[in-house]
Amino acid sequence: LRRQRQMCIRDRNYTVQQPDGSIDIEKAKEINEQFEISKQFWGHLVKSGQIENPREFIHPLPHISFVRGKNNVKFLKDRYEAMKNFPMFDNIEYTEDFEEMKKWIPLMMEGRENNGGVMAASKIDEGTDVNYGALTRKMAKNLHDSSNVEVQYNHEVVDFERLSNGKWLVKIKNRNTGDVFEHQTDYLFIGAGGGAIPLLQKTGIPESKHLGGFPISGQFIACTNPQVIEQHDAKVYGKEPPGTPPMTVPHLDTRYIDGERTLLFGPFANIGPKFLKFGSNLDLFRSVKPYNISTLLAAAIKNVPLIKYSIDQVIMTKEGCMNHLRTFYPEARDEDWQLYTAGKRVQVIKDTEENGKGFIQFGTEVVNSEDHSVIALLGESPGASTSVSVALEVLERNFPEYTSDWKPKIKEMIPSYGESLINDEQLMRKIRKQTSEDLELGYYDKAKK
């Protein structure tokens, strides 16, 4: 089962409750804008004929938050009040009405009693489900068909060497034949997911020091009963259990994988030494160096709750996963669900002036050498949904002398480039409408009500 990721409007990690009780939605604005930028680029690829059939990788899907308990209900209502008056989120709906929730999430309401006031939900209909595996294959095929690009599969970069002329010598292994060959280049871009940190360390640049990685597997339970799958049509987030890190927020999602509609619940984190799903059990240990061991130890001391949670997840059986699912879907039957292991993510651990040694970085991190000859993309959530914004950041930070020349072409691909979708409501609505049409998503605009 391929690991799927998407920007979730409902993810409350991006709307943080402040000490005074207010809700800060600034991160939600930023992430939402970045996702709108990604949609523009994908829409351009469709319009220009570089990829086809957007419904093979993106579907419209409501995003919903569902909570129980007085404190959680109050939080969700305060969150709704903070978001509803901002144009990006003004289509948000909120209810504590039992019958209304039965319309939004009928499967999840089966077996529940109407206790009034202990449950609440909020909903935005403009959410999406994105299959990044399908999108990646479409983009790779487009590059493969281009006369200007060579795409090599089953090849692995095994080492780097800085040459006296300033170029980089890249050593590459053909995993089919075992042959190793070399290639010289002026610039290195390392975008290898969980494998990025070991590759960055091989460059030996100073910026690769004092950082490490914490590998986490993702497990999901997937529904195998078509009748159950058809009763749910949303991505629904809950609230993280008390005493657990915010990254543990569970969700029950309608997903489209290889053209088939399915239903997933999770994730359940599972720690292990591999940096990649099919990596080596020595990955983590090989990444521990004299120059980063103090960073890793500091992270362990600072993040005891996360480590405890991860250990608890390792020993969780399918029965434990099903018990967790029943807090969402009380009528869930064991025989209708199957446990799968998805991909890997490697949370970046680094030293910072603001947070000291061993800070776990939640989010993507761009690392570049002082001379900008090495650029590495590290980290995780929000991940793929913001990848286009990250690519633009890489270009702007490392090739500033070219950005003015590139701007017209970038504007053609991403019409909002250089402008703010957060501060310009008219532009935001125009862009949303256009990308909705380009990607065949449908469109709902409160301004037209």
For the regions a language model picked out, list residue spans one by one:
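Short, small-residue-biased leader/transition segments that mark boundaries at the very start
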Residues: 2-9
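C-terminal catalytic lobe of FAD-dependent flavoproteins
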Residues: 120-126, 134, 275-405
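Flavin (primarily FAD) binding-site architecture
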Residues: 190-205
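Helical element adjacent to the flavin cofactor pocket in flavoenzyme catalytic cores
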Residues: 120-187, 385-398
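Short beta-strand to alpha-helix junction loop
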Residues: 30-38, 68-75, 122-142, 152, ...
